[in-house]
Amino acid sequence: MSTGSLSDVEDFQDMEMLECDGIKLDPNKEFGISNDSNEESSTCDNGSPKKGRGTSGKRRKASSKKSPLGTINQEGKQVQRNAANARERARMRVLSKAFSRLKTTLPWVPPDTKLSKLDTLRLASSYIAHLRQILANDKYENGYIHPVNLTWPFMVAGKPENDLKEVVSTSRLCGPTAS
C-alpha cells in the first residue's frame, strides 16, 4: 500500500513495465483488484501473480523484481521446509510404533482395543506400579535385594543408615556379592 512518501513517487517513476510470466505488461492498463485482502498482487489470466492497483485506484508500491538469489533463497526455504516435514513425519511414525508396542505389551489390554496415547501411558504406569508392588513385597526374600528397590548409589530406598549397614552386610545384591 502506498504511504505517500517520497520513495513511493520514485518507485512509480522507476517502474515502467510490469512482468507476468515473461510477458511485459503496460503499467497504465487496468489490472484486476483483489477484494478479499490487501495483497499486492492479483492473478493474470493464466493464474500467475501480477502487480495490481489497490481499491483507491492508486498504484501500490511494487516489490523489486525477483532476482535469481531471491528465487534460490525461496527454493532453499522450501527444501528446508520439506526436509523438516519429512523428519517430523518420521518422528511421528517412530512414536506411533512405540506406543503400539507399549500397548501390546500391557497384559490386560485386548489387541483390538483402541487406546489414546494418554490412556496407554496411564495403563503402562499403573502396570509398572503393580510390578513394583509385587517386587516390594518380595524384596528381602532369599537374601537378595532387587535392583528396583535400590537407589543411587545402590542403597536400599527408605532405610535409615543404621538399618542399611545391617541389610547390606546380611544381603547379597543382584549379581556378584557386594563387599
From Swiss-Prot:
Recorded hits in PROSITE patterns, A to Z, give: BHLH
Q: What is the protein name for this chain?
A: Transcription factor 21
Instruction: Please report the stretch or stretches of sequence annotated as the bHLH domain.
Output: 79-131
On tissue specificity, the annotation reads: At the start of neurulation (stage 13), expressed in the pronephros. At tailbud stage (stage 25-28), expression is high in the anterior-most branchial arch and pronephric glomus. At stage 40, staining persists in the glomus and in the epicardium region of the heart, and at stage 42, expression is higher in the glomus than in the kidney tubule or duct. In adults, expression is highest in the rectum and the spleen, with significant expression in the duodenum, heart, kidney, lungs, pancreas, skin, liver and muscle.
Q: What is the lineage of its organism?
A: Eukaryota, Metazoa, Chordata, Craniata, Vertebrata
A single GO CC term, please? Answer: nucleus
Its gene name is tcf21
Which GO BP terms sit in this record?
branching involved in ureteric bud morphogenesis; branchiomeric skeletal muscle development; bronchiole development; developmental process; diaphragm development; embryonic digestive tract morphogenesis; epithelial cell differentiation; gland development
The entry lists its GO molecular-function terms as:
DNA-binding transcription activator activity, RNA polymerase II-specific; DNA-binding transcription factor activity, RNA polymerase II-specific; DNA-binding transcription repressor activity, RNA polymerase II-specific; E-box binding; protein dimerization activity; RNA polymerase II transcription regulatory region sequence-specific DNA binding
